[in-house]
């Protein structure tokens, strides 16, 4: 599937934002002492990591076309 330039730029912006969120979650998780909150933050890290992998795949396919 061919992507328009504005679509690629949107994915790049989302990737930058999610990367920042991932960094923040990983950093804050180290400072949290509550186990339940730590578990929620770990889930966020896992989900965000998967999303970033999907974005990378989309961007890789967009560059090949």
UniProtKB/Swiss-Prot annotation:
InterPro entries: Spore_coat_CotF-like. This is Uncharacterized protein YraE. It comes from Bacillus subtilis (strain 168).
């Amino acid at each position: 599937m061919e992507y328009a330039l504005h679509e690629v730029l949107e994915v790049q912006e989302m990737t930058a934002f999610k990367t920042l969120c991932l960094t923040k979650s990983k950093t804050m998780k180290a400072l949290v002492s509550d186990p339940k909150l730590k578990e929620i933050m770990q889930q966020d890290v896992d989900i965000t990591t998967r999303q970033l992998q999907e974005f990378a795949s989309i961007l890789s396919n967009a560059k090949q076309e």
